[in-house]
Amino acid sequence: ALAGGLEVALTCDLLVAAEDAKIGIREVKVGLFAAGGALLRLPRRVPYSIAMEMALTGQPITADQAKNHGLVSRVTEKDGTVEAAMELAESIAENAPLAVAASKALIQAQQGITEEEFWELQKPHMMKVFTSNDAKEGPASFAEKRSPNWSGT
């Protein structure tokens, strides 16, 4: 994902990259800067110095470098990205919907708030998730050695 492609990719929670992928913001090479969000989102996903180097040099990084910096969660063989992304999606979909939604919301919200603010923000999510039917179904299915039947309620 280069330039605008990376800016779109950075809006995603999870990224899967092929082993031969090049990832970068090359706009400075043509007299522009990455105005579609990469300068905001990239430093939130990789170390500051890596984001700065990518933005100022226009040089892309490899998929393995992106994984090492935490930008992508999985690197696959050249033609394996769709399959790996589907496996990741299926793995997420196997879990309780309310718990997944709360986890995602809290991880997204934690940036820029204090620890005290986070604990307050978490309280309504705890009330909703920990009192849900899914919170009962999870331990019951575990005890009964069966797959859970999530209701999302």
Spans of model-derived segments:
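Short C-terminal tail/terminal secondary-structure segment
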Residues: S147-T153
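Helix-loop "lid/cap" segments that line or gate small-molecule binding pockets
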Residues: M54-A55, L106-Q110, H125-F130
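Short beta-strand->loop
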Residues: I113-W119
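Crotonase-fold acyl-CoA enzyme core
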Residues: A1-V100, T131-S132, K136-A140, R146
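A short acidic, helix-capping loop that chelates divalent metal ions and anchors anionic groups
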Residues: E27, A109-G112
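Intrinsically disordered, low-complexity regions enriched in Ser/Pro/Gly/Gln/His and often acidic
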Residues: G112, F142-A143
